[in-house]
Design a protein with these regions (language model features):
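Hydrophobic alpha-helical bundle architecture
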Residues: 113-117, 136, 143-165
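Internal glycine-rich alpha/beta core junctions
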Residues: 2-140
Length: 168
């Protein structure tokens, strides 16, 4: 989990590069002189984030690598958490026919036909969240490759998927 969380932190640096003012294909044509610098400085101040100007505007408008990379880092974190949740579910199975290696707290009534059974509801909930995050990353991956030539207009759906993942 620690390695996955470090990957998320590293991917954040790429997201701090702002590509505003590149116009349609990253040339900056018809953008007022100094616009990018002023806007990035103001966005950085208002958001309290360390935003910087994107140096390669053409690349950032045709490739959504930074968003896809952040999404995959979040997905990998979810994969790690999902694995831990699966282990908890299996280790807490029992009390008669399961592993019964650990006891987890009962969140609600267990089984009516198996007295004493505690359902691993929280671990199952974590699994469902992880599945959703993995699905969101699939959306980001398809959107990242859906660009055509110098422009990828799929950023809104990519950002929605990433924000949904970080909101879970």
């Amino acid at each position: 989990v620690i390695k996955s969380s470090h990957a998320i932190t590293r991917s954040k640096k790429q997201l701090e590069q702002v590509a505003l003012g590149g116009t349609a294909v990253g040339t900056g044509a018809n953008t007022p002189r100094g616009y990018r610098k002023i806007v990035v400085k103001e966005l950085s101040r208002v958001s309290k984030l360390g935003l910087i100007e994107q140096k390669n505007m053409q690349y950032s408008l045709q490739s959504r690598f930074a968003v896809a990379n952040a999404s995959s880092a979040i997905r990998n974190f979810a994969i790690e958490l999902g694995k831990i949740s699966n282990d908890i579910r299996l280790m807490s199975s029992g009390p008669v026919a399961g592993f019964s290696e650990i006891n987890i707290p009962a969140v609600h009534a267990g089984s009516s036909i198996m007295p004493g059974k505690v359902n691993p509801s929280l671990a199952e909930c974590m699994n469902m969240i992880c599945f959703s995050i993995i699905g969101n990353d699939t959306t980001v991956a398809f959107a990242a490759q859906a660009g055509q030539f110098e422009l990828n207009v799929m950023l809104p759906v990519m950002l929605k998927a990433v924000l949904d993942s970080t909101d879970m």
